[in-house]
Amino acid sequence: MLIPKRVKYRKQHRGRMTGKAKRGNRITFGEYGLQALEPAWITNRQIEAARVAITRSLKRGGKVWIKIFPDKPVTAKPAETRMGGGKGAPEKWVAVVKPGRIMFEVAGVSEELAREAIRLASHKLPIKTRFVKREEMDGEANES
């Protein structure tokens, strides 16, 4: 499970998820990627489930990169607790994902195998995603 080793502050504000991803929206390591089309908080458990789905589908072939890290603590108060008494204890860790963000990358396998692995991973995530190729991403960069 991915969690930060140490953080400066134990609790954080929720923040806003407006706009598109300005960073991490290009394929940098692999040949194929899984791109987010909606904004969401992705928990460390969801990231791990998607990673396991990809690695099992690839059957020890190819390489997988996880491009998001859950560095935001989400707090929760116990059930049936009265209001007040301060902010709850950190419950889970999430990665803030905006539209356009590349979440996973795959290399060293055929396109069909990569497409299937990424399809299985996308079912583990709570957002709409799409399969992207490095060639397509390079084409978009040249146009703009």
From Swiss-Prot:
Gene Ontology MF terms in the entry: rRNA binding; structural constituent of ribosome; tRNA binding
SUPFAM superfamilies assigned: Ribosomal protein L16p/L10e (SSF54686)
Superkingdom, natural source: Bacteria
Matches recorded under Gene3D superfamilies: Ribosomal protein L10e/L16
GO CC term (a single one): cytosolic large ribosomal subunit
Presence of keyword rRNA-binding: yes
Claim: Ribosomal protein is one of the keywords in the record: yes
Similarity-based family: Belongs to the universal ribosomal protein uL16 family.
Role, per record: Binds 23S rRNA and is also seen to make contacts with the A and possibly P site tRNAs.
PANTHER family found in the cross-reference section: 50S/60S RIBOSOMAL PROTEIN L16, LARGE RIBOSOMAL SUBUNIT PROTEIN UL16M
Subunit relationships: Part of the 50S ribosomal subunit.
Name of the featured protein: Large ribosomal subunit protein uL16
Organism: Halothermothrix orenii (strain H 168 / OCM 544 / DSM 9562)
